[in-house]
Amino acid sequence: DEEESIYLTHFSAIVRARQNQHYQHSIGMLDENEWNAMVSSFKTLLSDPKNLEIWSFISPTFPKDFVNFVDEKIKEGQIYTKN
């Protein structure tokens, strides 16, 4: 439905922005405090099952290094929530 389409578009845009920040960090253009804040915020987004479902659908459209980064953060979140 339309609401789901809007949510998918919104979440996809957020992930694209995070991918850009990941790239900027990898080339030394992003302040470490800004990076840490982004990672913390991103891990919160990745704790939502709906967002994980969307990620599984859109992840092939991202660079492999970013996919690995996101998958690592998802695993960290799963470990955290199990403790």
What is each of the regions a protein language model found here?
Residues 1-83:
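Amphipathic alpha-helical "stem/stalk" segments
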